[in-house]
Amino acid sequence: MGFMGTHYPRLDEKGRLFLPAKFRDELADGLVITKGQERCLYVFPVAEFMRITEALRSAPIGAKAVRDYGRILFASAYDQVPDKQGRLTIPPNLREYAGLTRDCVVIGANTRVEIWDAQAWEEYLRAQEPAFAELSQEVWPTVS
């Protein structure tokens, strides 16, 4: 069914974060964490990351946007398996990129999980929610 919901875990001093219990099963065999858009982090199940990898691999190498996106995506990607307590370790460079502090927000975003700094997530919502109804007019025709 995909990842859904909003959760509020805390980052510990070692950069570890408890994954929400409802996400653990799908990520238990491995995940890839990397930079996302809007200064969040993307967490993909390995199978989904492989699907993205194949899509980028089949794109023309002459496409500059594909090369640029792929470089940043793959250079910042880390694969790992959550520990027995269901924690993932966020590397320092990714914590810095996303501005992660102690208070984080973990959201389900269908095929991926996103990790946000709590304040950045609140700012994003304040900026985006007024346009939510208008965006639905653009998005729904593409999915129905």
From Swiss-Prot:
Q: Which GO terms describe its cellular component?
A: cytoplasm; nucleoid
| Stored PROSITE patterns | SPOVT_ABRB
Q: Which Gene3D superfamilies match?
A: Transcriptional regulator MraZ domain
Q: Name one GO biological process term.
A: negative regulation of DNA-templated transcription initiation
Q: Which Pfam families match?
A: MraZ
Specify the signal sequence span.
Answer: none
Task: Name the SUPFAM superfamilies for this protein.
Answer: AbrB/MazE/MraZ-like (SSF89447)
| Keywords assigned | Cytoplasm, DNA-binding, Repeat, Transcription, Transcription regulation
What coarse category fits the chief subcellular location reported for this protein? Answer: cytoplasm
One GO molecular-function entry: DNA-binding transcription factor activity
Domain SpoVT-AbrB stretches: 6-48, 77-120
* Location relative to the cell: Cytoplasm, Nucleoid
Q: Which domain of life is it from?
A: Bacteria
* InterPro entries assigned: MraZ (IPR003444), MraZ_C (IPR035644), MraZ_dom (IPR020603), MraZ_N (IPR035642), MraZ_sf (IPR038619), SpoVT-AbrB_dom (IPR007159), SpoVT-AbrB_sf (IPR037914)
By sequence similarity, the record places it as follows:
Belongs to the MraZ family.
Q: How does it assemble?
A: Forms oligomers.
| Record's protein name | Transcriptional regulator MraZ
Gene from which the chain derives: mraZ
